[in-house]
Structures are given as C-alpha cells and as structure tokens.
Amino acid sequence: MFNRIRISTSLFLLLISFCIMQLISTGLSYVALRADNHNLERITVSSQQRDALSLSWVSLLQARNTLNRAGTRAALKVPQEQVDALMGGARSSLQKADLYFNQFLDTPRADEQEQQLADATRDSYENLRGALRELIVFLENRNLQAFMDQPTQKIQDRFEADFVQYLQLAKATTDEASASSQQAYGWSIWLVAGAVLMLLVVTLSAMWWLRTMLVQPLNIIRGHFERIASGDLSAPIEVYGRNEISQLFASLQRMQQSLIGTVGAVRDGAESILIGLQEIAEGNNDLSSRTEQQAASLEETAASMEQLTATVKQNADNARQASQLARDASSTAAKGGELADDVVTTMHDIANSSQKIGAITSVIDGIAFQTNILALNAAVEAARAGEQGRGFAVVAGEVRNLASRSAQAAKEIKLLIDESVSRVKHGSVLVENSGATMQDIVRSVTRVTDIMGEIASASDEQSRGIEQVTQAVTQMDQVTQQNAALVVESASAAAALEEQAITLADAVAVFRLADDNFVAPETSSTVKETLDCQTA
C-alpha cells in the first residue's frame, strides 16, 4: 500500500504535518509570549512610574528640607551666602523633581482610572512645587514670617496621599501582571508537553515510514550495486510499486540490462578485435617478408644501376673520344681531298705539257723526216757529183743517219710521251676518282662525326637519366626501409592494441552474466612472433 504513494507526496505530507504543528506551537507560543510581553510591559511601566514618582517625591522632600534649613539659618541671621547656597541646592532639587515627574508623566497609562489618578497626582505635585517656590521667594525677600505661616505641610500631605495611592495602584497592576504571567506559564507548560508528545508520535511514525519506505529499499539497492560493482549481473532486479524508489529499482534494472548488453558487445568487440589483430599481424608478417625481398631487389638494382651508370659514362667518354677522332679524321680527309684536287690539277697540267711535248716531238719528227729527205737529196746530188761529192755524201749520210736516229728517237719519245700522256690521263682519272672518293669519305666522316656527336649527347642524356633512375632507386630503397620501419611500428602497435584488447577482455571478464561461458583470451602467438621478428 505505502509503496504506491510517492515519496515526494509522503515527504510533502510529513512536511505539512510538521509545518502545522510548528504553526500551532508558534501561534500558541506567540500568544503566550505576547501575554508575557504585555504583562512585562505593564510591570516595567509601573516600575518606571513608581521609580520616577518616588525620585520626584524624594527630590521634593530634599528641597523642603533644604528650604527649612535655609529658613532656620536666615532666622539665626547667619551670613547670606550660606542661605543662598542652601536655596541653590533647593532649586537644584526642584529641577530634579521636575525632571523625574516629567518622566512619570511621559509614561503611558493603562486605563482611565490610572489616568485620573495621574492627573490628580500632577495637580498635587504642582501645588507642592509652587509652594516650595514661594518659600524660596520668601527667603529671597527675607520674609521669614510669610515663610513660617505658609501651609506647606498640608499641600505636602495631599501630594503624599496621591503618591501613596498611585504606588498602591502600581503595586496592584504589578501583582495582576505577575498572576497573569504565572497563569500563562502554566498553559505554556501544558502546550509544550502536548507539542512534545505530538512531535514524538510524528517522529516515531516518520522513522517507521523512513525505515520501511527508504532505508530497507535503499539497502536492497545497495546490495544490487555491490553485486554489480563486483561484476555479478546475473541477479534479477524486481520492481514493486510506483513511487520514486520503485522508479529507482526500474532504472537500476534498465542499467543492469544495459550493462549486460554493453558487456556482451564489448566481449564480442574484443574477440573481433583480436581476430582482426591476428589477421593484421599475419598481413604485417607477409608485408615484412615482401618488403625485405623488395629491399634486397632494390639493393641489387641499385648496384646494377651503379655499374650501368659507370658503363654508360665510359661509353659517353668513348663516344666523345670517337667523335673527336672522327672530327680529326674528317679534317684530315678534307685536307686529303684538297690535296687530291691539287694533284688532279697538276696531272691536268702534266697532261697538257705532255701534249705540248708530243706536238714538239711531232715537229722534231717532221724536221728529221725533212732532214732525211734533204740528206737523200744531198746524197743523190753527191752521187751525181761523183768524187767531188763524196765527202758531201759522207756528210749527207751522217746527217741522214742522225736524221734517222733523230726520227727514231723522236718516235721513241713520242711513244713514251704518248704512253706518259695515256698514264697521266689514267692517273688523272684515278686522281679524280680518288678526289670524289675523298669527298665521299669526307661526307661519310662528317656524317660519322655528327652521329658520334648524337651518340655522345644520347650517352650523356642516358647517363643523366640513369643517374636520375639511380636516385629514384635510392629513394625507393629509403622508402622501402621506411616502410619496413613502419611495418615494425605497425606490428608493435598491433601487439600493443592486442594487449589492450586482452586487458579490455580481462576487464569485462569480471562481469558474470546469465548462462556465461566467456573465457578471457590470451595473446596470440602470431602477434608475438611477428613482433619478435620485426623487433629483431
């Protein structure tokens, strides 16, 4: 029944009960305090009135006594200074009496009777005060007879009667206020006892309600929290009622179900992470092996590229040297072509000279022939002359012989010249062919020079390209080494992550679920081997 009432409503009702009791107690206390305060004010005012009136009465008596002494001394004819001093004291006493009586008049009055008595007292006081002032005037005027004849005692007795009557009224007021205070005190005792009894009943009821509705359910909730803190999620949480504690049980039940789902999800996630980490470790192992093979291949490639670079550089140097030799050969061939041209020109000149010599030889041959004819004619004429012409015949014979020999020599010279001309022509043709060949050689050498220059340029470009390839291979080698380092770091991270996953699995392993068969995993050997291999 009580667990269907909301705790806030119960606390509100309890608070309302305490407030009602407090209001009742406060109201009654206020009434009692107000009555006590009223009685206390009455007693205080009465005391103030009595004190002020008493002091005023005492001051008037002092003034009367002082004036009597002054009158006695004036009658004894003492120095006037002493009399004046006593009259000054009397005046001071009258001023004090006025001050005290004004305080008496300023106090409030409780009722009409008290006010009437106060008015009568004021009249008698003023009469007595006026009489005392007349005595002072009589003494100042040295009218001792009038001083002695004034009926001051009657006036004083009247004021004394009013004074005593007012004191009796003040005493009656004080006694009445005290009796009222005693009666209020008795009622207060009964009220306090009733309030304490009611408070005790309400307190015991509140304690029973708190124990039933709060303490016991909170102890049950604490037990559930302790079991959850120890990792036991298998204990069922039952919900009763519809108050805040029941809502707390429902929230705790939802929290338990949520924790069960979370722990299950974390366990599944830890297992999935471990499986993924094992696959990552195997992949890292394969990647590390391939990276090492790639690094070795890149090192071999780098060495081959270095050798190829040296070979290409050497080829480039040889090509430059061959190009230089080709340029030298081209220059030499050009010079040979120029010399061949000069030889052709010279051979042409020799051929022309040989032809001229042949013409001269023909002339000599003609002259020899004519000389022979002339020698024949001379021989004929010598024969005709007989003995006289014998010497001339001998001379003619010698001339003929010389002409024959000259003709024969001219023929031989002509044959030689013809042969020489023929050979010169053949040599000229050969020289011309040689010049053409030399020009072909010059063109070929020039082409070879150009080709060798292109080869040298291509070799330089190949050398630069190979250097760039070598740099690229070196960079690839560095990148491969960095990749290998990253593989090591990845393996280390995977191992650390697996350890964290195992730690997480160990952390959630403390939770016990219904139908629980979860076993915390251990570090996989693959990750350990991969980490050890990569670290090594």
UniProtKB/Swiss-Prot annotation:
Subcellular locations according to the entry: Cell inner membrane
Residues exposed to the Cytoplasmic side: 1-10, 210-536
Membrane topology according to the record: Multi-pass membrane protein
Domain Methyl-accepting transducer stretches: 269-498
Pfam family, one: HAMP
Residues with the Glutamate methyl ester (Gln) modification: 293, 307
InterPro entries reported for this sequence: 4HB_MCP_dom_sf, Chemotax_Me-accpt_rcpt, Chemotax_Me-accpt_rcpt_Me-site, HAMP_dom, MCP_chemotaxis, MCPsignal_dom, Tar_rcpt_lig-bd
Keywords, ordered alphabetically: Cell inner membrane, Cell membrane, Chemotaxis, Membrane, Methylation, Transducer, Transmembrane, Transmembrane helix
Region feature The 3 Arg may form a positively charged pocket, which binds the alpha-carboxyl group of the attractant AA, mapped onto this chain: 64-73
UniProt keyword Cell inner membrane, yes or no: yes
GO CC list: plasma membrane
Residue ranges occupied by any HAMP domain in the UniProt entry: 212-264
Record-linked CDD domains: HAMP (cd06225), MCP_signal (cd11386), Tar_Tsr_sensor (cd19407)
GO biological processes: chemotaxis; signal transduction
SMART domains assigned: HAMP, MA, TarH
Gene3D superfamilies membership: Aspartate receptor, ligand-binding domain, Methyl-accepting chemotaxis protein
Periplasmic domain ranges by topology: 32-188
Residues bearing PTM Glutamate methyl ester (Glu): 300, 489, 498
UniProt family annotation: Belongs to the methyl-accepting chemotaxis (MCP) protein family.
Name of the protein in question: Methyl-accepting chemotaxis aspartate transducer
Organism (species): Klebsiella aerogenes (strain ATCC 13048 / DSM 30053 / CCUG 1429 / JCM 1235 / KCTC 2190 / NBRC 13534 / NCIMB 10102 / NCTC 10006 / CDC 819-56) (Enterobacter aerogenes)
Upper taxonomic lineage: Bacteria, Pseudomonadati, Pseudomonadota, Gammaproteobacteria, Enterobacterales
Chain's gene name: tas
